[in-house]
């Protein structure tokens, strides 16, 4: 099947009639009919049967259409990639992050960077890691912040910070909590894979009566005194009052990774943001660590 035959076949399938397909392709109906007949001659079987003035796809056509849909999706992705390659990279960049970071850490840092760079065009998006990786592949975004060490294709993951985890509980008032002493009957599963994995390295909590898909939803229940949870310090500070946030003994952390394409250099403004981000994280996390765990002077941010 040649490309022009694929085009007329796919358009007839999606439009439902030869006349609408011809209109969509900006050709005459006789030309569309001739192209469809040529496709059937080339293939050696009928693609459509005319029944009461309507074109009904054959069994073979339905099977071909499944494959054709994938081809057209790839073409759509190719066009999107070409559009993204054509954009002016000099004073703009796009950052993706996890939803939990998009409600706490990222807006704070991005606001300060944006205000210091008046000629900047900055686009932010919040998605789960799998979607962020796809967007990096298509060059829809330049950078991504996630809590998973993705190693996939041309994607490079760099550890940029170790973020403290904290225990959140409206009713707890006894200082640092040992993870083994947390009441599993009150436990709210946070749902986030990377966070759950970090917690499971210290303790595996059995399934409970309350499970949520995001740490922010878990903290809404914590606010109401329904249960307790463990989350990152940035999300906790965004959602809860200080008396609901408690240290964990021994200290726990979750890794923060910067994702980018390994086969493409960063534009000057994107590199400037990366430097700004790492410096800001270094300073903030040093203060947070000393506040949570006095005497722990370890540097917890590594250079990119």
Swiss-Prot record:
Induction: Expressed in late logarithmic phase of growth. Pfam families: HTH_1, LysR_substrate. The keyword Nucleotide-binding does not apply. Residues 1-58 form the HTH lysR-type domain. Its main location: cytoplasm. GO terms for cellular component: cytoplasm. InterPro entries: LysR_subst-bd (IPR005119), Tscrpt_reg_HTH_LysR (IPR000847), WH-like_DNA-bd_sf (IPR036388), WH_DNA-bd_sf (IPR036390). GO terms for biological process: positive regulation of gene expression. Disruption phenotype: Deletion mutant does not inhibit growth of B.subtilis and shows decreased adm transcript levels. GO terms for molecular function: DNA-binding transcription factor activity; sequence-specific DNA binding. The keyword Cytoplasm applies. AdmX-mediated transcription is inhibited by indole-3-acetic and indole-3-pyruvic acids. AdmX recognizes and binds the auxin indole-3-acetic acid (IAA), which causes conformational changes in AdmX that result in the inhibition of the expression of the andrimid gene cluster and the suppression of antibiotic production. It also recognizes indole-3-pyruvic acid (IPA), an intermediate of the main IAA biosynthetic pathway in plants and plant beneficial bacteria, which also prevents andrimid synthesis, but to a much lesser extent. It is found in: Cytoplasm. Keywords: Activator, Cytoplasm, DNA-binding, Transcription, Transcription regulation. Residues 18-37 bind DNA. Positively regulates the biosynthesis of andrimid, a broad-spectrum antibiotic, by activating the expression of the adm biosynthetic gene cluster. It specifically binds to a region within the adm promoter. Belongs to the LysR transcriptional regulatory family. This is HTH-type transcriptional regulator AdmX.
């Amino acid at each position: 099947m040649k490309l022009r035959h694929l085009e007329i076949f796919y358009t007839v399938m999606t439009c439902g009639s030869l006349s609408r397909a011809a209109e969509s392709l900006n050709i005459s109906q006789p030309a569309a009919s001739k192209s469809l007949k040529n496709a059937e001659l080339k293939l050696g079987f009928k693609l459509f049967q005319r029944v009461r003035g309507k074109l009904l796809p054959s069994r073979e056509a339905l099977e071909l259409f499944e494959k054709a849909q994938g081809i057209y999706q790839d073409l759509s992705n190719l066009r999107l990639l070409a559009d993204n390659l054509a954009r002016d990279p000099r004073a703009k960049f796009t950052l993706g992050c996890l939803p939990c970071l998009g409600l706490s850490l990222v807006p704070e840092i991005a606001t300060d960077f944006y205000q210091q760079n008046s000629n900047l065009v900055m686009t932010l998006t919040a998605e789960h890691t799998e979607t962020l990786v796809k967007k990096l592949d298509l060059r829809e975004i330049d950078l991504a912040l996630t809590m998973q060490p993705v190693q996939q294709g041309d994607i490079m993951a760099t550890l940029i910070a170790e973020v403290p985890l904290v225990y959140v509980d409206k009713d707890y008032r006894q200082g640092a909590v040992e993870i083994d002493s947390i009441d599993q009957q009150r436990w709210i599963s946070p749902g986030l894979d990377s966070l759950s994995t970090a917690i499971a390295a210290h303790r595996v909590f059995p399934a409970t009566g309350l499970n949520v898909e995001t740490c922010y939803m878990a903290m809404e229940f914590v606010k109401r005194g329904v249960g307790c949870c463990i989350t990152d310090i940035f999300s906790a500070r965004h959602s809860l009052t200080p008396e609901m946030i408690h240290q964990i003994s021994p200290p726990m952390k979750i890794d923060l990774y910067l994702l980018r394409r390994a086969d493409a250099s960063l534009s000057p403004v994107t590199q400037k943001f990366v430097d700004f981000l790492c410096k800001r994280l270094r300073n903030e996390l040093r203060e947070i660590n000393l506040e949570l765990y006095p005497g722990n002077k370890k540097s917890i941010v590594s250079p990119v």
